[in-house]
């Protein structure tokens, strides 16, 4: 038997050297990696030449030789106790410290970043990989629109607003929402609101309108009466921008709703978007003008869109993916767009398509 030395490349350019028997299984390699990388073997995903290594296979199966490099991706894992817990029980035990950050205790972390999508969907959370040095700029309107085109994201958002526990957490996390009248909860649970929150065309139209008004020196809020149901846009819903229930009453479409203070309503919904804003989702919505369309405080003009071709915009990320063996340019670019430019998220997307 012959020992071989391998270089394990992890996130943030971390490298580990491990020595194993050349006839070892992939599982044995993971066991050797665990103590040096401080990642349990169950949470390791090893990639070599664009292929995910299977535990039961031997290193020889993949023609791995002395001096070769293997890429390590840390995946979402569960401890035995968590695995034995019923899913419905877990969803009811939602923490209330959403504003504490995007850590593992924030159940919206998977949903509120352009990198990842999904509450109760087996996607990695943004906090798993730490800061995102590859793409510190908030995602663009088009990237957010692409994310909203993903059925998994749409399903996640719909599930979130349909889940009473999640809705309670969102409302209780903010003084604006906590003190809001009952119609706000009704509106958040309405199909029109969910459709607007998951409609990429609405985002694009709002962004375009916001940019045009900003370029002309016009405050969009001056045309909307400062509220959810201003003339012209009428809030959300309808044909993308038509309104919940009329030009002057954002809740007219909700049975039994009384007239409301539109400024208070605007602040309430803007605060909701801020809560959803984790690492860029809410910020992106605000920059796109959707926050302003909902009647919140007027947001600054959206930054200029990055019009560079993808081979320039994602040059560094594409190089990393090519090094791992992912050489299909179109698939790589599509994955990077879905992940907001994050390499780790793109890897998960590419592997999920295999």
UniProtKB/Swiss-Prot annotation:
The keyword Transcription does not apply. Keywords: Ubl conjugation pathway. PROSITE patterns: UBA (PS50030), UBIQUITIN_2 (PS50053). GO terms for cellular component: cytosol; nucleus. It comes from the Eukaryota. Residues 1-78 form the Ubiquitin-like domain. CDD domains: UBA_Dsk2p_like, Ubl_Dsk2p_like. Residues 309-353 form the UBA domain. GO terms for molecular function: polyubiquitin modification-dependent protein binding. Signal peptide: none annotated. GO terms for biological process: ERAD pathway; proteasome-mediated ubiquitin-dependent protein catabolic process; ubiquitin-dependent protein catabolic process. Protects ubiquitin chains against dissambly by deubiquitinating enzymes thereby promoting protein degradation. This is Deubiquitination-protection protein dph1. It comes from Schizosaccharomyces pombe (strain 972 / ATCC 24843) (Fission yeast).
């Amino acid at each position: 038997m012959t020992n071989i030395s391998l270089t394990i490349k992890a996130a943030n350019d971390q490298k580990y050297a491990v020595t194993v028997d050349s006839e070892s299984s992939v599982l044995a390699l993971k066991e050797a990696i665990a103590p040096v990388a401080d990642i349990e073997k169950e949470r390791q995903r090893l990639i070599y030449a664009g292929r995910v290594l299977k535990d039961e296979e031997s290193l020889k199966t993949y023609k791995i030789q002395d001096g070769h490099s293997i890429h390590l991706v840390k995946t979402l894992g569960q401890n035995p106790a968590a695995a034995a817990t019923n899913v419905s029980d877990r969803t009811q035990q939602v923490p209330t410290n959403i504003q504490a950050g995007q850590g593992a205790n924030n159940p919206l972390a998977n949903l509120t970043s352009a990198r990842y999508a999904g509450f109760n969907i087996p996607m990695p959370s943004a906090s798993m990989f730490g800061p995102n040095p590859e793409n510190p700029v908030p995602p663009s309107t088009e990237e957010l629109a692409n994310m909203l085109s993903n059925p998994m994201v749409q399903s996640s958002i719909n599930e979130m607003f349909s889940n009473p526990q999640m809705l309670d957490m969102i409302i209780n996390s903010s003084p604006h929402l906590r003190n809001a009248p009952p119609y706000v909860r009704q509106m958040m649970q309405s199909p029109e609101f969910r459709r607007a929150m998951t409609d990429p065309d609405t985002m694009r139209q709002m962004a375009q309108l916001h940019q045009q008004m900003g370029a002309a020196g016009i405050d969009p809020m001056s045309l909307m009466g400062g509220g959810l149901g201003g003339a012209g846009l009428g809030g959300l819903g309808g044909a993308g921008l038509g309104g919940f229930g009329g030009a002057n009453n954002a809740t007219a479409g909700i049975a039994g709703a009384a007239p409301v203070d539109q400024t208070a309503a605007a602040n309430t919904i803007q605060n909701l978007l801020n809560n959803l804003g984790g690492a860029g989702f809410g910020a992106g919505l605000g920059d796109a003008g959707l926050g302003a369309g909902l009647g919140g405080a007027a947001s600054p003009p959206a930054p200029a869109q990055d019009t560079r071709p993808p081979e320039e915009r994602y040059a560094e990320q594409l190089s990393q993916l090519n090094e791992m063996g992912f050489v299909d340019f179109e698939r790589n670019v599509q994955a990077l767009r879905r992940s907001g430019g994050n390499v780790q998220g793109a890897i998960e997307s590419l592997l999920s398509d295999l």
